[in-house]
Regions:
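Active-site substrate-binding loop specific to GH73 endo-beta-N-acetylglucosaminidase modules
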Residues: 122-129, 162-415, 419-472, 642-645
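Bacterial N-terminal signal peptides
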Residues: 15-28
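Flexible, low-complexity segments enriched for small/polar residues
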Residues: 45-46, 53-60, 76-77, 113, ...
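Substrate-binding/catalytic groove segments of enzymes
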Residues: 66, 158, 246-252, 286, ...
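N-terminal accessory alpha/beta regions
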Residues: 63-192, 290, 296-297, 304-306
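Bacterial Sec-dependent N-terminal signal peptides
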Residues: 25-45
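Cell-wall polysaccharide-cleaving catalytic domain and substrate-binding groove, primarily
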Residues: 46-98, 208-209, 216-223, 240, ...
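N-terminal secretory signal peptides that target proteins for export/translocation
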Residues: 1-11
Length: 645
């Protein structure tokens, strides 16, 4: 079964491409397309290029001809798996590109101090993200950080996250301006892209942006006479979204059931209450203040304030007899059957901090963590419906990287990207008479809808882009290459702007239509098939995307206003413009666009429709610009390009 945005035949006029998109589902694998070859050596080269493009479309923000050629060359030399593993090692060895630093660089290049207040500086946060996604060398780290940001979600709707304020924290020091806090959170995710899950969970918990977003900041211990109890928000979400999910899972992704056939919850309301007691006493970092109610400081991890941390006595003290303890009241905290260590009296900051870390140890050790987290990572990086075998192989690496280490993110990312299932969405068949590589797609269980941001970044990166921005990145000397937050109005997705802690879309979302109720094969661990990215594809958003994409293809640039001036990113397609002078070169142009944008999945039917439509409208060499623009628009709007195999 194959979810496709079924495209009616394109109608091409002199400057307009109209493609009507209808959400639909086919029920079988289909021929994606063919790549002609002159000899066996070309067959090998073509296969390597397609495999390289397919891998890079998942591991980066989009392949380029240069990155395809580089990886394909190594595939020819040492084989697919070794070449890709080598590439991963090289990527994680690169210095991390910092969102915070790039944002500071852009605002400084614009002639302002990074800590200047009152200039709407939060807009630079988005500009920095796009510049890094489009140009950074450490593509894999940034792509994994993007995936992690959709699991450990914060959003700019958080209180003060867009403020231009900074404040003194004693000893002559000041906080960073509030708007940079989200950039530091994203950098933290990027650092842990090749780190350890348990350490990531700790840094997420102590980060002030997460503390503010999910109410752990200033969360106070209970006061029974006053009717006050700890806020349960972070306790609930760290379990539901950041670690174990709602229901118990087998390591191959299947949901466990009890004797009555019912799903087995991973936690209950009492578990939330118990864990909420742990996440008390958090305040923002201050050098000298003794107050629990210190103001925002998004540049340093939160601190523990022991006086407001649940000390296992505040539930037991008799309010009518201070100091008298009810012996039947709980004297400890128990999580998942594990009783946390006793707390000293008086309680110290160090002991309260240690209790938080002990609780995180308990959470991270749960059996549900590997399948829950690995499934989300696979969905964000590779495919919507990983098989049971795929899940088993990846969760095995999560549990033990081969050296006795649990939660090694480097090993997990390798297991995800090097798994044979990554390339099983396409079969590359050698055919003769004539000699060619025929690409056959396997259908829904091996695919996913490309999310809007990936469609934009992949498109731009493939077009040999140049920027006309008036200032340059000090690391490269090249102009900053940026989009702005305004693009959200065109594609319904924007970094740092998830509508809620549940991300842009749910992992178990099923779009209306044939997919609902369609039984998957036995290789799939769930009873249904899911397509998360379809949740942001509505009739309205699809229409906006068509209009915007067709316009970009027609003008061959993308431009948005920045905080200062505007940035135009131009497509360098001079080679293809020269080819487009002759209609006979249209197959070669489509071959290039197919490799760059579709990883070889552009069907022969789509190619034929595009060629027929273009040749019926234009024949002279002077119409080469029109031909190229129409070909580009038709490819980028095709269902073959929208669906990643």
């Amino acid at each position: 079964m194959h979810p496709k945005l079924l495209a009616r035949p394109a109608i091409l006029t002199k400057s307009v491409v109209v493609v009507a998109l209808v959400i639909g589902f086919g029920l079988q694998a289909c021929d994606a397309g063919t790549f002609p070859a002159a000899n066996s050596r070309e067959i090998k080269a073509i296969r390597s290029q397609i495999r390289a493009s397919q891998f890079l479309s998942k591991a980066t923000f989009g392949p380029t001809q240069e990155t395809i050629d580089s990886l394909a060359g190594r595939i020819n030399q040492i084989g697919y798996r070794r070449a890709c593993e080598e590439w991963i090692d090289e990527q994680f060895a690169l210095p991390m590109t910092s969102q915070e630093q790039v944002a500071r660089d852009i605002i400084a290049a614009d002639g302002r101090e990074p800590d200047t207040q009152g200039v709407g500086a939060s807009l630079y946060r988005y500009q920095a993200w796009w510049h890094i996604a489009l140009t950074s060398e450490d593509q894999l780290r940034q792509k994994v950080a993007w995936a992690l940001s959709q699991i450990f979600v914060i959003s700019d709707s958080g209180a003060a996250f867009n403020n231009d304020d900074k404040r003194a924290i004693g000893n002559g020091e000041f906080t960073i301006t509030d708007w940079l806090g989200m950039s530091t959170f994203y950098d933290m995710l990027a650092r842990h892209a090749s780190g350890n899950y348990r350490e990531l969970l700790s840094d997420v918990t102590w980060h002030p942006n997460m503390g503010v977003y999910l109410s752990a900041w200033r969360n106070r211990k209970s006061n029974i006479p006053a009717g006050r109890y700890p806020d349960e928000n972070y306790a609930r979400e760290i379990m539901q979204l950041f670690s174990i999910g709602l229901y118990q899972m087998h390591q191959d992704g299947r949901l466990k059931r009890n004797a009555l056939g019912e799903l087995i919850p991973t936690y209950d309301n009492e578990g939330i209450k118990e864990l909420a007691r742990v996440f008390t006493g958090f305040r923002t970092h201050h050098n000298t203040s003794s107050s629990f109610f210190t103001n925002y400081n998004f540049g340093s991890p939160m601190q523990m304030y022991a006086q407001e941390h649940d000390n296992n006595l505040n539930y037991a003290e008799d309010p009518n007899n201070p100091g008298q303890v009810d012996p039947s009241a709980p004297q400890s905290k128990t999580l998942f059957g594990v009783t946390l260590s006793p707390l000293p009296t008086p309680l110290t900051n160090e002991a309260a901090t240690a209790e938080v870390e002990e609780a995180l140890d308990v959470i991270a050790s749960q059996d549900n963590v590997p399948p829950f987290i690995c499934r989300l990572l696979i969905q964000r990086l590779v495919k919507s419906n990983p098989s049971r075998a795929y899940m088993r192989r990846v969760t095995r690496k999560f549990r033990d990287n081969g050296h006795g280490v649990r939660g090694d993110m480097n090993a997990v990312i390798k297991a995800i990207l090097l798994d044979p299932e990554v390339v099983r969405g396409q079969r590359l068949m050698r055919r003769t008479n004539p000699l060619r590589v025929e690409v056959v797609t396997r259908g829904t269980e091996h695919s996913r809808l490309r999310e809007p941001i990936q469609r934009i970044t992949s498109w731009i990166r493939a077009m040999r882009p140049t920027s006309n921005y008036y200032t340059s990145d000090p690391r490269t000397g090249k102009p900053f290459m940026m989009l702005s937050h305004s693009i959200q109005g065109d594609i319904d997705q924007m970094p740092y702007r998830a509508p809620s802690v549940f991300n842009y879309y749910l992992p178990d979302y099923q779009p209306p239509g044939d997919l609902v109720g369609h039984p998957p094969s036995s290789r799939i661990p769930r009873e249904g098939l899911f397509a998360p990215e379809f949740q942001v594809l509505t009739a309205v958003s699809a229409n906006r995307t068509i209009n915007r994409f067709s316009y970009i293809a027609r003008v061959r640039y993308i431009q948005y206003g920045m905080r200062k001036n505007s940035c135009r990113i131009s497509f360098n397609l001079d080679e293809e413009l020269e080819l487009a002078k002759d209609n006979a070169n249209l197959p070669e142009i489509l071959r290039r666009f197919d490799l760059w944008l579709c990883s070889g999945s552009l069907s022969e039917q789509t190619k034929t429709s595009i060629i027929n439509a273009i040749t019926s409208e234009s024949t002279s060499a002077s119409q080469n610009v029109l031909r190229l623009e129409e070909a580009l628009a038709a490819v980028i709007l095709s269902p073959d390009c929208a669906i990643e195999e």
